[in-house]
């Protein structure tokens, strides 16, 4: 039982700690950036682009490869035909047979040479055997025994000129890496804007909750005062009913605000990766005045073109399409490469068909020159140029849209500042009106209905001021994002 209680305390304790901790806007931003899965994916895409760039850089270097093979054939390679083998094996026999016929003709023509010819004839068998042996040795020497063949080679290739393809491909991978980095920067700004909106929504509802409580307490006190006036005969039951209706409305408003605040906190927890039931407290929740120093606005839109991630991505895309034009052109330019290597075989090919591994070194140059392709290269290059032109037009259009978006964001930020000043002035008047109405109601010169109206105006003025303050914060974040510098 003690172990169970101890475990339960350990499980509940972190939630209590989270609930007690007060989070600032920067802390919420950092939490959201760390736990966001899409940002993790974009970071991995940067790593992939980096590896692609490094892989492209290796194309400048020589490539070394190893090749090997084994082959078993049903018959060996024969350098001699069967007739040639038979002729060589019986070379002595055939030669002595022809020689015997010639010697018989000599004896017929010159009988006196018969003893000499007879002595030579006795040597014919040994001569025939020796010559047959020599012929058979030639046949045996030309026996390849290549039914089992093994070959291996080490190859080296060094590109010398590829029509600019290697350099263009390196540029493409470099720009692709920069695009991935800009995507991550844009994704971070999107997450930060979501955090800012959720954060200030919680702050807004927390302030409205306090305002709703103050309004309800004000009506409860008024209800008590009216009941006392009724007992004194100064007020009527209708006055009490009016106050009661307003009090019920205030209770309903407070309930809605509290429910909205709970949902807003849960949304902020989801964005920041916190437990949904943690109910974090924010640093600005207790602040009465949320207005900050006005942000200086740029006089031109060039800053947005420089920092906006979307524009930077499109600029790099234009560079990529320009490099692709060179890639297409390089396919129809001469390609020059240095070749070298070492090859070995078994049986050896450099000393007959010797049964051992022997190899040879080799070095050379290869040149490939396209001669005629019916205009294919020209058409492909023009197609690549058209794609590059499309990318430029997309960039120009995006610049115009960004310029419009920045202008709109500036107007909204300026409008929010003006609304805040007006709401503060309106709040001062509403508070003064409420003070006068409360004093007059105590003196009996102001009716309950007029006091309720003054209280409602006070509530609306406070609510508008809270909305104006939050609107200033959010529009500033939106302007920063439009300029491409949110969170930087």
Language-model segments: which ranges?
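Bacterial Sec-pathway N-terminal export signals of envelope proteins
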Residues: 19-78, 234, 276, 283-319, ...
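Small/polar (Gly/Ser/Thr/Ala-rich) solvent-exposed segments
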Residues: 40, 64-78, 137-147, 157-186, ...
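Amphipathic alpha-helical coiled-coil segments
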Residues: 41-56, 187, 193-210, 221, ...
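Transmembrane beta-barrel domains of outer membrane proteins
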Residues: 57, 157, 326-329, 366-368
């Amino acid at each position: 039982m003690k172990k169970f209680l101890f475990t339960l305390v350990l499980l509940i304790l972190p939630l209590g700690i989270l609930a007690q901790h007060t989070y600032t806007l920067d802390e919420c931003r950092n939490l959201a950036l760390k736990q966001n899965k899409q940002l993790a994916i974009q970071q991995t895409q940067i790593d992939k682009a980096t590896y692609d760039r490094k892989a492209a850089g290796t194309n400048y270097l020589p490539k070394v490869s190893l090749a090997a093979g084994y082959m078993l054939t049903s018959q060996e390679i024969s350098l001699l035909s069967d007739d040639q083998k038979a002729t060589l094996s019986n070379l002595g026999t055939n030669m002595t047979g022809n020689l015997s016929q010639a010697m018989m003709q000599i004896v017929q023509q010159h009988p006196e040479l018969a003893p000499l010819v007879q002595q030579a004839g006795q040597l014919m068998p040994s001569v025939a055997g020796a010559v047959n042996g020599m012929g058979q040795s030639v046949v045996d020497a030309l026996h390849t025994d290549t039914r089992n063949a093994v070959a291996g080679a080490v190859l080296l290739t060094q590109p010398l000129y590829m029509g600019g393809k290697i350099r263009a491909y390196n540029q493409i991978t470099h720009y692709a890496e920069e695009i991935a980095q800009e995507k991550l920067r844009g994704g971070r700004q999107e997450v930060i804007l979501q955090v800012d909106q959720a954060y200030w929504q919680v702050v807004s509802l927390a302030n409205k909750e306090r305002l709703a409580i103050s309004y309800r307490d004000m009506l409860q006190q008024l209800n008590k005062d009216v009941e006392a006036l009724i007992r004194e005969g100064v007020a009527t039951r209708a006055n009490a009913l009016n106050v009661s209706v307003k009090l019920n409305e205030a209770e309903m408003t407070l309930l809605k605000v509290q429910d909205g605040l709970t949902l807003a906190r849960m949304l902020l927890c989801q964005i920041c990766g916190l437990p949904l039931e943690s109910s974090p407290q924010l640093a600005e929740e207790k602040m009465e005045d949320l207005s900050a120093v006005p942000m200086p606005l740029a006089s031109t839109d060039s800053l947005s073109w420089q920092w906006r991630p979307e524009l930077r991505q499109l600029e790099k895309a234009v560079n990529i399409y320009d490099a692709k034009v060179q890639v297409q052109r390089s396919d129809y330019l001469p390609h020059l490469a240095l070749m070298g290597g070492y090859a070995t075989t078994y049986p050896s090919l450099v000393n007959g068909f010797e049964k051992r591994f022997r190899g040879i070194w080799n070095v050379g140059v290869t040149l490939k020159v396209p001669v005629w392709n019916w205009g294919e290269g020209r058409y492909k290059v023009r197609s690549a140029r058209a794609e590059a032109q499309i990318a430029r037009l997309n960039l120009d259009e995006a610049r115009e849209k960004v310029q419009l978006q920045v202008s709109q964001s500036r107007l909204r930020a300026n409008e929010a500042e003006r609304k805040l000043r007006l709401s503060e002035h309106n709040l001062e008047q509403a508070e003064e009106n409420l003070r006068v109405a409360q004093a007059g109601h105590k003196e009996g010169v102001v009716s309950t209905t007029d006091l309720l109206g003054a209280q409602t105006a006070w509530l609306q003025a406070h609510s508008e001021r809270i909305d104006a303050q939050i609107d200033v914060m959010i529009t500033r974040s939106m302007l920063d994002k439009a300029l491409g510098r949110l969170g930087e």
